[in-house]
Amino acid sequence: MTTLTIEDLAVMLLPGQAIAGLDLGTKTIGLAMSDLGRRFATPRPVIKRVKFTQDAQTLLAFAEKEKVAAFVIGLPMNMDGSTGPRVQATRAFVRSMADKTALPFVYWDERLSTVAAERALLEMDVSRAKRAERIDSAAASFILQGALDRLSALGRPAFPDLDS
């Protein structure tokens, strides 16, 4: 397993491969999945955290079932750009995954993703109880969508041009 930049991931991905987005929390792991065209991120049910070994098994079973080619994981930077304990915990999680999978990880700045997810859920008039259940996966979706938008801006098509 390696960590890549989004630019390196763009070069490595094959057409039609999906990407998973992760929002790592202390109690849950928010999940999102791209479509095969890598244009849209869709929230998926959260993984309830237990212990790292079980969390990794659940995540990798999801990745195998969904044919995930890479993970984009939110990096919870402070608003001033500095790092703190949550960034260290996220990097430790990714390092620990190195023993479990060859799938690459891309770190993605997640500042304000939870705020944006909360706002979107409020605009959809989702109840407080349902928001609490869905916020982490909604945040993972915002994280993944940012990465998908960057991949698109890099000009790497998800599918080859069939007219050439």
Curated annotation (Swiss-Prot):
Keyword Aminoacyl-tRNA synthetase assigned: no
UniProt-annotated location(s): Cytoplasm
Record-level GO BP terms: rRNA 5'-end processing
Pfam family, any one: RuvX
Domain of life: Bacteria
HAMAP family in the record: Nuclease_YqgF
Enzyme nomenclature, EC number: 3.1.-.-
Predominant subcellular localization, coarse grouping: cytoplasm
GO terms assigned for molecular function: nuclease activity
Gene3D superfamilies per record: YqgF/RNase H-like domain (3.30.420.140)
GO cellular component: cytosol
Family: Belongs to the YqgF nuclease family.
NCBIfam families from the UniProt entry: RNAse_H_YqgF
Keywords tagged on the record: Cytoplasm, Hydrolase, Nuclease, Ribosome biogenesis
Purpose of the protein: Could be a nuclease involved in processing of the 5'-end of pre-16S rRNA.
Top EC class, one word: hydrolase
Protein name: Putative pre-16S rRNA nuclease
